[in-house]
Amino acid sequence: MALHSAIKGKLISVIGDEDTCVGFLLGGVGEINKNRHPNFMVVDKNTPVSELEDCFKRFLKRDDIDIILINQNCAELIRHVIDAHTSPVPAVLEIPSKDHPYDASKDSILRRARGMFNPEDLVR
C-alpha cells in the first residue's frame, strides 16, 4: 500500500495523542513504508521526550513525507528541534488535541510565517 501511495504522491505524517492519530488514520492517512516504518506516532503521558524527538527527526529525513502534523502540546516538548527545522519541506503544522486547544501564540512556525509578510501588502 505504501509503495502505491509513494508513486502517486507524498505522505502526511501525524504525531499526537491517540484520538488525533486514530482520526487521521480513519481518514486514510496511515501508511507503512517498505522498511515497515509507519508515518504516525501515538504519544501518551508515558512517552519519553527522546522517543518523540527521534520520531520527529525520522519523519524529517524520510523523502516520502511532505507534511508533518503534530499536536501542539507534543510540539512544546520538542520546540528546540522544531525551531531548528527551517526547510519548507516537510512542512510542520501544529494542530490542537482533544485536551489541549490550539494557541497561536505558542506556534513558532506561524510566527515565522507571519514575519515573511508585511500586513500592508495583504490589504487591497
Swiss-Prot record:
Alphabetized InterPro entries for the sequence: ATPase_V1-cplx_f_g_su, ATPase_V1-cplx_fsu_euk, ATPase_V1_fsu_sf
SUPFAM superfamilies assigned to the protein according to its UniProt record, in alphabetical order: AtpF-like
Keyword annotations from UniProtKB, A to Z: Hydrogen ion transport, Ion transport, Transport
Keyword Membrane: no
GO terms for MF: proton-transporting ATPase activity, rotational mechanism
Family matches, as Pfam families: ATP-synt_F
The keyword Protein transport appears for this protein: no
Any one cellular-component term (Gene Ontology): proton-transporting V-type ATPase, V1 domain
The protein's role, per its UniProt record: Subunit of the V1 complex of vacuolar(H+)-ATPase (V-ATPase), a multisubunit enzyme composed of a peripheral complex (V1) that hydrolyzes ATP and a membrane integral complex (V0) that translocates protons. V-ATPase is responsible for acidifying and maintaining the pH of intracellular compartments and in some cell types, is targeted to the plasma membrane, where it is responsible for acidifying the extracellular environment.
Subunit details: V-ATPase is a heteromultimeric enzyme made up of two complexes: the ATP-hydrolytic V1 complex and the proton translocation V0 complex. The V1 complex consists of three catalytic AB heterodimers that form a heterohexamer, three peripheral stalks each consisting of EG heterodimers, one central rotor including subunits D and F, and the regulatory subunits C and H. The proton translocation complex V0 consists of the proton transport subunit a, a ring of proteolipid subunits c9c'', rotary subunit d, subunits e and f, and the accessory subunits VhaAC45 and ATP6AP2.
Family statement: Belongs to the V-ATPase F subunit family.
Protein name: V-type proton ATPase subunit F 1
Organism of origin: Drosophila pseudoobscura pseudoobscura
